[in-house]
Amino acid sequence: MKPPILITIMLTVVSGTMIVLTSSHWLTVWIGFEMNMLAIIPILMKKSNPRAIEASTKYLLTQATASMILMMGVAIDLLYSGQWTMSKTLCPMASAMMTIALAMKLGLAPFHFWVPEVTQGIHMSSGLILLTWQKIAPLSILYQISPTINPNLLLPMAIASVLIGGWGGLNQTQLRKILAYSSIAHMGWMAAITLYNPTMMILNLTIYIIMTSTTFMLFMYNSSTTTLSLSQTWNKAPLITSLILMLMLSLGGLPPLSGFIPKWMIIQELTKNEMIIVPTLLAMTALLNLYFYMRLTYTTTLTMFPSTNNMMMKWKFNNTKKMTLLSPLIVVSTMLLPITPLLSILD
């Protein structure tokens, strides 16, 4: 893809998300979603092959269906309230339809089936955008309608997402699918806290985007797509191996790394709201995610396949320009826990 075309498409993707973030009118929200969806399709098809075309088609059909359900909910609310502007007094039917539509866009269970398939069929860089930037717009709308959401609808989807995100990643060897199931699980955590402290959901989203972006960038730098290729990283770049180990444990939410912050604060907030069963289930199902992250770290660091590489190990990177952005991202992805007391403003 030529640079001017790519820049135009990326600007359209960003503009669509910004329109959704800044809108208080349902029609402009829908326009922003459609701009974003139509612009992301060429990015998903950047590597033109049958798998990418199939993945783009699945994404298009899913997002178009979700937009249709969202507009049906908006139409019902229009009949109920007589206005197009967002309000905190949605009728129950409109709120339920909007929640289902946003769950489809985010890939929450039971509407999660498209996430692993689409992520596996596209390039790593496209997967990075799909699993990070594309979550911002739907979560912003979920944030705005959170006072009207029925907990009996969203909480089961959140728990199921964390459970499926853990189970689905257990038998995977493809790194993109593992990150896709990780995304489903993280979306479940965000959906669970949206009902009780939407601001904490923004914190969770920020940390998730930083950690996932760093992981994708390390995989792209190392040209790793499977656990087998990841296990051979030690022969090429021991430093990357160590960084991947830390990032995997952080994504799994293991203290004292950054990924522990959102899980800790979400469980604490749910407990404050006299929810005992939900945080217990979330904490138990998070062990599934931690297991396959631990398996990845074991594959990366503690197993060494036979290698005929007689060259010296690359303790220094040849092209440091690519690593410039990674340095601060890795620090933030792993070492944020000491600043947790400063986050008391979210209470």
From Swiss-Prot:
Leader peptide range in chain numbering: none
Is Lyase found in the keyword set?
no
Q: Which InterPro entries match?
A: Complex_I_Subunit_2, NADH_DH_su2_C, NADH_UbQ_OxRdtase_chain2, ND/Mrp_TM
Keyword annotations from UniProtKB, A to Z: Electron transport, Membrane, Mitochondrion, Mitochondrion inner membrane, NAD, Respiratory chain, Translocase, Transmembrane, Transmembrane helix, Transport, Ubiquinone
One Pfam family name from the record? Answer: NADH_dehy_S2_C
Q: Which GO MF term does the entry hold, naming one?
A: NADH dehydrogenase (ubiquinone) activity
Reactions listed under catalytic activity: a ubiquinone + NADH + 5 H(+)(in) = a ubiquinol + NAD(+) + 4 H(+)(out)
Q: Zinc-finger: is it a keyword of this entry?
A: no
Query: Which residues are listed as membrane-spanning?
Result: 3-23, 25-45, 59-79, 96-116, 122-142, 149-169, 178-198, 200-220, 237-257, 274-294, 325-345
Q: What is its EC number?
A: 7.1.1.2
Topology in membrane = Multi-pass membrane protein
Coiled-coil spans are none
EC top class named in words? translocase
What GO biological process terms are annotated to this protein in UniProt? mitochondrial electron transport, NADH to ubiquinone; mitochondrial respiratory chain complex I assembly
Q: What is its main location?
A: mitochondrion
Location relative to the cell: Mitochondrion inner membrane
Q: Which GO terms describe its cellular component?
A: mitochondrial inner membrane
* Superkingdom per UniProt: Eukaryota
Q: What does this protein do?
A: Core subunit of the mitochondrial membrane respiratory chain NADH dehydrogenase (Complex I) which catalyzes electron transfer from NADH through the respiratory chain, using ubiquinone as an electron acceptor. Essential for the catalytic activity and assembly of complex I.
Could you give the subunit structure recorded for this chain? Core subunit of respiratory chain NADH dehydrogenase (Complex I) which is composed of 45 different subunits. Interacts with TMEM242.
- Family under the similarity heading: Belongs to the complex I subunit 2 family.
Its recorded name reads: NADH-ubiquinone oxidoreductase chain 2
Organism, by scientific name, is: Cynictis penicillata
